[in-house]
């Protein structure tokens, strides 16, 4: 699979230019998935996706060329050759590269492509939101801060606080927009806009606990969001449920699917012991240690907004009886291969939260 190959290349890249090559390969390999349906909406979404990501890539490439034109090839090893650059040059290059990466990470104001990409099928949406594309941008931000500039240089240039502010704005804005959506996939899309910026926030705070929180969220958000998209896809495929109002009685019709969806949603809110609580806990500790106590308000506000747009879905599904006339002729959860992926990732979300901190736990 070309997408998996590109994502693996991004993770294993040892230099900026190698990272960029795989970064672009990921864009080109995911575009056909966005336009897969071939209808007008999908084509428009694909066009928007390319425009946004290509503009971001141009900014990133310009920053890389500027950097390497002065210092030579830049390895991911906090290159001391960066000391040759002036403070202004370092700041502008940082803005170009982080801004370019921020497009793929769907940070405000470069997030517009992500909700439109919901025209793609649910498995593709899961790939875009939980596994590959937005995570490539967020991962790139972390690597650029820590492995190219280094946290000492970022702190010296006072570049962390502005990035933390942008990430915080994105977190709250994405949650507010999610609250306005009636389409389930669009609600999940704006939720991703919010949640992925936790990773950039952790990197910008430049402390050990905040960094752990951001990197842990890279994994945890992926598990929870892919669970939500798998479950949403099953609901749409089996029952035709695509909007919030149609969720009435879904828990009685498809209890296993809704169990998986509920675990993912509660994890996004930050309810222990699901995975999302762990990453938010580390981010909160890191914020206090770094003197960014205002970040606690951002985390608390985001969690409350997450509850505001997820709990009504769960209430409709579990506590409101389905209208008999709305029952489709088909019944049950559907084939095992439809529900099993959501259950597996839901259990993984629960397991990594329960066993976080254990000796054998990678998180």
Can you say where each PLM-predicted feature lies in the sequence?
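Cytoplasmic/organellar membrane-interface segments at the starts of transmembrane helices
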Residues: 244, 251-258, 310-363
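Short phosphate-coordinating micro-motif centered on Lys-Gly-acidic
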Residues: 24
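Hydrophobic transmembrane alpha-helices and their helix-loop junctions in integral membrane proteins
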Residues: 2-19, 28-281, 285-317
